[in-house]
Amino acid sequence: TVSRGGNYLLNIGPDALGDVPEKSVEALHQIGEFMRLNGESIYGTRPAPTYPYDVDWGYFTVKPHKLYIHLFEDMPDVYLINMGNKPRRCYLLADGTELELRERITCEHVHSWRIFLPVKRIPQIDTVICVEVEEESIWFEKITD
């Protein structure tokens, strides 16, 4: 939702007796823990420019000099092509674990990033990778023929 400029509303309220159901309390605790570890990737962010390819594993949010990659699947690595920015640093937002990012430029001058994820990491519904870049704005290269 945030990655497209929206807000996420929680439909949580009391039952007829004025008690908040236990499942709702658990959901609030999970969201609170996620936000404690990864709130930087949500608060004050903007939607990323439209990525030129469809991805079914996650979404992007941005702040100046930062791209946040939200992964909703357990993956050994992330491969992104048509990356317009020069990466400086790459890490898991939840615990600061530094990640290996390999930048590649093809003979057609298309830039790609391959980010390698650790096998053991904090289990989360949304694993957030932060890539700090040299440029203030995040941009993706256009697809060329």
Identify the function of each model-found stretch.
Residues 1-145:
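Mature catalytic domains of secreted/periplasmic carbohydrate-active enzymes
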